[in-house]
Amino acid sequence: MKQEKERILKLVEEGKLTAQEALTLIEKLDSDYKEKEEKITALSVHVHDEEEPFTTAKKESGKPSLGAKLFDWIDSAVKKVKEVDLDLNFGHAYDVQHIFQFKDTDFSSVELQIANGSVNIVPWEDDDIRAECQAKVYRADSQDAARHAFLQHIECEIKGNKFFIRTEKKTMKTNVTLYIPQKEYDKIRVKLFNGPVRGEHLHVKEFSAKTTNGVLSFSYLTAEKAIAETANGQIKLASHSCGTIEAETINGLIDLRGKSESIDVQSFNGNIAINVTESDCRSIYAKTTTGNVELAIPDDLAVKAELKSNLGTLSHELMDVEMLKEKNDTIQKEMMFTSNQAHDQNITVFSESLTGAIKLKYSQR
């Protein structure tokens, strides 16, 4: 936020902004930052609750403000991340390796809930499920005590049609590579407090991956609905085929390259890059506070677009454009236009950034 305020004040010094215009922008930054700070704190507390069942909070209706600035978010969520920086706080650790394997399994849902560590999900052609765990156990007196603590504080089993791994032990860092039978699943949900989540070639109806501190990266994801949320980290989906995608990060890039019908992404301190490869996409909503936005869509869609930025530039490379509204004030840029209206398939695009540039262009197939 400090950098953004300095930028606004510099524009005042250069005579490009009036004092009142600068005050309006600074108030907006402050207001958005308070909202986002409350959300970060709520998220951190939510994840730490060891007694909490594996549930997902219902998303508020409407389009919430993305908040302002994550240069100072260290005062809230990062402070909690430091609490689980195990190597610094807890000293020596014992390495524990363990494999859970279940023969000839039959389940349709996968859930993983881990306090600290990482998750990598890989489908394979075997009917077994195999979880390879590499853990660091802190505050243990011996190797045997560390192994006992690991097995005591991790749950890994199949109940009904659900396979799950769960550990809320904060003095344990558990890295899991999970091999699952290659088939379509009803649900896959992964929730970490501290650590990255990765996967490839997953085929699922409902997919959810959430972490407070870490990258979310998936290739060849096929899902009817996909949700990805992180406070501090990038979100990357490559070669995906999804119905709806919802992605949100506070500090990090959002990069989506693939096929989807509906996209809703928000970042605070990070760029957004979306490349839609097929013509069945019907809507894109992309919002960031301090980052740039670059959107690429197929050239055989009838487009209705609205682009907004306070301090950044707006541009497009579309054909047959009819400009409905255009505003280019010092603290408010706006474009509303249609394009390629002769085509039968339609797409609606909305993108907004407080300080970044926005560009809409055609994707290369």
From Swiss-Prot:
Q: Which InterPro entries match?
A: PspC, Toastrack_DUF4097, UCP012569, YvlB_N
Domain of life assignment: Bacteria
Coiled-coil residues are 18-46
Give GO cellular component annotations, separated by semicolons.
plasma membrane
Q: Which Gene3D superfamilies does the record associate with it?
A: 2.160.20.120
The protein's name: Uncharacterized protein YvlB
Record the organism: Bacillus subtilis (strain 168)
Any idea which UniProt keywords this protein has? Coiled coil
Classification lineage: Bacteria, Bacillati, Bacillota, Bacilli, Bacillales
A matching Pfam family: DUF4097
